[in-house]
């Protein structure tokens, strides 16, 4: 019964986050007998702002723990977001600071999170990527800004 409750809780928590599409990975080291370290790129659309797509690159630790999810990935990432369609969302109705994407980077409590912030005075949406842990996070971070522009028809 506890297991069923945990699965249901995880399903509810993941409803609001965007789902990423993996685009590919590039090896950054060569390990002869185990999986290589690599950098992987994923894409996701902002679930509340249709017309904005983001791409995130993240370092992935190789080694023998990698196939089992036991490695803790480093907190190295980059994010780039762009307007790719007309945006009709009223910025004043968006939450001031809302998580739009999260991805586990360790089997034990480490997560990359992306938050959306709204800069109403500049008509811009800011995306902030950070890494969190249960006890402490990392000062590593990255941002991408998307000025909302008129879209040609």
Regions found by a protein language model. Name each.
Residues 4-13:
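Sec-dependent N-terminal signal peptides
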Residues 8-9, 46, 59, 86, ...:
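Residue-level marker of positions within ordered structural domains that often coincide
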Residues 15-20:
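Sec/Tat signal peptide C-region and signal peptidase I cleavage site
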Residues 21-74:
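N-terminal secretory signal peptides
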Residues 26-34, 44, 101-104, 112-120:
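Short acidic-hydrophobic surface loop/beta-edge motif
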Residues 51-118:
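Mature extracytoplasmic domains of secretory-pathway proteins
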Residues 121-153:
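C-terminal partner/receptor-binding element of secreted or periplasmic proteins
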């Amino acid at each position: 019964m506890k297991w069923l409750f945990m699965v249901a809780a995880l399903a509810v928590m993941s409803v609001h986050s965007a789902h990423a599409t993996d685009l590919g990975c590039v090896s950054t080291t060569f390990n002869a007998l185990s999986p290589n370290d690599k950098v992987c790129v994923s894409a996701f659309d902002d679930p509340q702002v249709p017309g904005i797509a983001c791409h995130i690159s993240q370092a992935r630790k190789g080694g023998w723990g990698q196939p089992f999810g036991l490695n803790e990935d480093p907190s190295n990432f980059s994010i780039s977001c762009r307007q790719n369609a007309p945006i009709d969302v009223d910025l004043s109705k968006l939450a001031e600071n809302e998580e739009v994407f999260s991805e586990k980077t360790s089997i034990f409590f480490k997560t990359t999170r992306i938050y959306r912030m709204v800069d109403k005075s500049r008509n811009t949406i800011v995306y902030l990527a950070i890494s969190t842990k249960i006890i402490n996070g990392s000062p590593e971070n990255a941002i991408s800004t998307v000025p909302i522009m008129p879209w040609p028809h």
